[in-house]
């Protein structure tokens, strides 16, 4: 997705939060207060000084008046005044003392009150603090429990969004993350952690309630990067990233201001060609990226002259095609750098990128390849996305889309492609083809005229569908002939008008037939027909109909009968393979249909273009340390070739990887990104629209190394000695040997001011030191040197300094030479040099080493005392800085001439630096090893001890195979201790060292001794194993035993051999040695040992069985023996155990074995036979006993017995104590999982909450909670249950009983909860229903009713007296009415009714006659209702037989509802 560009005119707005304003306010107030205090102090000091000066003046004046003796009267007057003042002063002092005492007492009282108040407040604070601490401890525990429950890994809710901004604007990246504990967020820029302290004010990072923000202030071009945010907590890590592209505003909207003119003039859009000198300082290299990532190709350069108004032109090319800015690419040029940024890479962007700086002075360019790999597929094994979508032949409703296929190496081949279209301005993608199209071309029809579309393609293989390709450029569905029919008519003067050709043709009614019908595209899936519109065509819109006919059939079939075609193009699908067709086209408008066009020639649906043949011979050649040049012969059949794909494989692995991800059109390709020193093979395949060719033949194996060239020039030519007639010169070897060993050097000389050079040596000189003879004393000479290798003679060095030929006679030594460096690390390096050729008047006794930073002036001496060695390790250097060094030799006469300054050395460890490793090989030889994958054919390993090359063949042996070298120590001892180093020539300073100290040597020698004197490794030591029948097996297992291995068993220092008592055997294939004892008894206590010999190797293992260890083995053996005897008859394979079924029944289960028909199985409880409904089926081997609704009555000892003539066995399980508790918990688990939701049942007593379960007992651990507070059973809230449910009865509920109720049942591990919110409408409805039930119960309790006394049938003889008596109840007393046959009974002597104490009621019928037979009813009713009871009376005559009737029963009452007024009450 492209980045959203922020408009350049958007202004920056800085926001200040509340805390910032508070800080500013506090600062101003503090500053104001300090100034106020200073001014107050100054004014008080000033007034104080004025007051003191005035007092001094007044005292002096007063003193002067007293001393004056002019007037005696004045003196006496003053004495009186003085006396009066003294008495007034004493009274004032007394008053002031009293006032002061009163004030002191008042202040003391206030102080006592303050102390008392302070003590009270302190006591309150201490109490509050104690309570607060208690609450904090409780909350901390609850918080810990809560935090554990809500802990989760980070999850990003809103991801980062990419931005494109102008330079010097601010950009803010935001995202939202949640998680607990709160995730820690770190920001990264291109994988590097962002540090705010490194660039103060540059970055601002904020975090508020899960929203994290990174603000980049005043963004510049270097801030273009991929920014990532990583959120981490204890449960995981998650990240998100976005791209920030910083564009440079070029000032197109703002005119350039002239310095000399008062007005602004716009800069000319034409850049005048001016001569510029362009020098690249930093260049972009070969780049590897993946689809979807961002990248910026950038070059920094020095442009001379640097003119602000006039600049050279920067042009970017991809595969020699000029690029322009688009939504995918952004370009920038200015301020000494040119860049090309990609906001979202696709494989379309892969290619060779070239930056060309064009000016009058010429073209300066730089090229490098950008590789774009496939993004991870949506489905594993799916192919990569197609690329390079192009739209061709766009018309009113038709366009052809073409693309290039993806490369497949490890994926299965591509079977076809799906083409999708999307109307511009929408985001609705529509698949154009139902079945995958086989070739990389598809005609899309059904477009709407005038609308614009974009397209994308997806590849399909057997694994799935690829990611979609990059969308194509928008294409409009328009007729390209419309502009062709537009003509210009010239009028008088320079005027002209534009008219359509249709206006010149006049009014045409029915159009003519189309012309030029032909097949423009033929493939196996479709045929594209093209034609020319009829002439004249008329002004009305034209439509076309296409007809087809099989050759020879004579019948025509209209292809587009339903939808007319508006474009002179049409793709015909569904043609039968192998048959030829002819076509014709008819044009139509609103006036009618034209005649058919001419018939085309026969056309057959087939692939005109075939798959290309495989490319020819593939040749790989060396290029650089990480690249190889691959060339191949073009295929014989290269019709419509799209390009080639190159694959590579590490030799011997058969794991092929693509080298390029977009077809290349030339038959030579440089493969980058290879591993130095690795061996590869290559293959090539050709690609066209139909598919890919077969793979070419594989290339020969090639090792990745730099190409063989001539060596670079030597350098550092130094004069080492001169005797007046000859000079001894030294120099340094070339930095690059060219890939082959240097064979020697050629030296040329000339006198200063001479033009011609003269050859010094006709044959190459091998050493890097040479004496030049035949020189003239006092003359000045200069020299140059060239190196030679197998490729030829390299470039000569620059001429040396001017050396004067005069004899050296100074007593001090000459300069050291050939300064080299190795083991360059982050803070240290090792420096080596060679001794001076000229030693002076006495031998060289030591050396001083000086260093300095490259641009510093003063030299710093490393060693304060001279070193006698010609090497020195320089430490404590600063990483990343560049230093230069020199060496000064010292003899008895002083310090000699310093050596030439070394080349600058960057103190930094090389990436991938390897060190020497110490080890022991399979033969026990100690060695030091070193690997170097960067070596070339000319590279050599040089091993040194104390930095002196090793040449002692008696103590050392060097073996080098490929890029691996080993230094063997033949007879290691203390003389071999020291520092060993290795260096590899013709590399970028690859070297390492290793200090062999006594501890390391001892370790290596111990390992060597173990290999030379081996022991047999054991997989397992001697152990025992007890079998059935009580047999004991002693065994061990060795890693490996040869057929010649021997062994022996020793028991208590006595060897035992294979016998009936001790059966010993050995399986040498598996290494197992064992001894089996059939009878293990008390006599077998002791120590068991096995000794093994196999060639030189030997091993021993012992097992001590004494004391408790022996008793354990003996008891186990006896137990196994008894078990064996038990299993000879019927026995339990699994003893009695229990589980709980889904129906909450306890099931006792045991497994039996070795039974027969006569075997008797019994269940016993407390030694009493336990009867079961069904007998167990012993053939199944499983016996079960179900105990439904377990309770304490089921406590007891349960036994299962087996018995027949072979023996018997018993299994016992006691249900009590912990076993019973565990059963209850298991039942709780089943019931808790199946418990129903809480239900509300209203009763006259209150509201009842019920939870139905499969089984419930009071012994289950259940809790009822109200608002998360546990409820205890009370009169107000009663807790109980039945076998089917648990309930909570809320008696007489009130408003306080509202809230959430929870029922919990604990199963020993988990709490199973059911909750109900009894508040709001739910509580109101339940409370109303409770009131109704309560009123109904009250009415039911107090209504009129019959307590007893009346039968339902009465039989009596005529003439007798019938007395019907009953007892009634009601509150208030009920009204009693008697009826006969539903009619009121008229009281008389015959019928009499009696009521006693308002509850005993009787009716008497005297002299019963047959007319008294019938139904008698009694109504008992008060205001709460009542009952009606019917009694049937049957009268028979005297002498008649008593009728047969059912025995009388209690009469059944019928309810009588209460009156309306009573119901309302």
UniProtKB/Swiss-Prot annotation:
The keyword Repeat applies. It is found in: Cytoplasm, Myofibril, Sarcomere, M line. The keyword Repeat applies. Residues 385-480, 513-608, 614-707, 710-812, 815-912 form the Fibronectin type-III domain. It comes from Homo sapiens. GO terms for cellular component: M band; mitochondrion; myosin filament. Residues 41-61 have a biased composition (Low complexity). Interacts with TTN/titin. GO terms for molecular function: kinase binding; structural constituent of muscle. This is Myomesin-2. GO terms for biological process: extraocular skeletal muscle development; muscle contraction; sarcomere organization. Residues 154-245, 266-371, 904-1002, 1130-1211, 1345-1434 form the Ig-like C2-type domain. PROSITE patterns: FN3, IG_LIKE. Residues 38-61, 1442-1465 are annotated as: Disordered.
